[in-house]
Amino acid sequence: MAQSSDYWIYEVPPFAILILTVVATECLIGIIANGIVMAVNVVPWVQKKAVTINTKILLLLSVSRIGFQSIILIETTFSIFKDSLYDSVSYCFSKVSFVFLNYCDLWFTALLSFFHFVKIANFSYRLFLKLKWRISGLMPWLLWLSVFISLGFSMFFCKDTYTVYNNNSRSFNIFNFTAKVCKVETNVVYVVSLFSLGLLPPLIVSIAATTLLIFSLRRHSLHMRHSATGSRDPSRESHMRAIKETGCFLLLYISNAVALFVYMSNVVNASFFWNVVLRIALPSYPAGHSILLIQNNPGLRRSWKQLQSQVHLYLQSRF
């Protein structure tokens, strides 16, 4: 089962520069945001010589996202200004690193959602109570397991599988000055297999954990509303805000997984427009999700405001 398409690839240099500017802005914002997350969580680790599970997950998540954003920025820059990257071993390395870091991002985010669900949700089932008691001991093993799973499945992209049965001997550069015809055949069975093994497990974990957490928060919020005596209940309002934030996280996560699947499968390689959309969409999730994490965490939010004030003072002194 293969899908074939012939298409022309043209370059519009000003548009290419615009794409690079947008992608670079997203990546720099993401790197700064995740750098703040990493710095805020590293300091107590160094001071106290100990780290909580939540801190460990946030550290791994921020490191993987900084690496991912850096690879996207380098790859986009090379694709515009230098074509030789796509004829060398470095191209294969960049693609494997891209997939590995993206898988790690998906797994770490899913495990963060799972950890919050177990810690926050209120269910009386015996299995859930036992899991709540043991979750702190299980999470380090789950984190290491997710890293090995991500590394294992990213190795499938070492040998020409990232472009999924491209009839041409080399990958094309969508910003090439010379117009040319390319033919791409996408093996649907192979792509679905990779999706099922690499992307689907963390996606299922994240959706299940987030949905159950929203259900638990919603049930507790309704209980507080029935038992409340005043017109306004700050605790209930905080629960409703947590439900909205959790739902927003889930929508961002699903959108990123879908965009990654489409990008990896070459389904829209026949469309220059959709290639551009994916190039812009992929780095937006790590940046946006990290900013939301900062906004919802008092310590991270305080560090973010301090950085903003320092940048503002620096700009005032220079200009």
Predicted regions and their residues:
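Class A (rhodopsin-like) GPCR signature focused on the TM5-ICL3 interface and adjacent 7TM helical core
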Residues: 110-111, 196-226
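Fourth transmembrane helix
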Residues: 108, 134-167
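Structural signature of the GPCR N-terminal helical module
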Residues: 24-84, 108-118, 244, 250-252, ...
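Extracellular N-terminal segment of 7TM GPCRs
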Residues: 1-32, 195
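Extracellular-loop-to-transmembrane junctions of the mid-late helices
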Residues: 153-159, 179-209
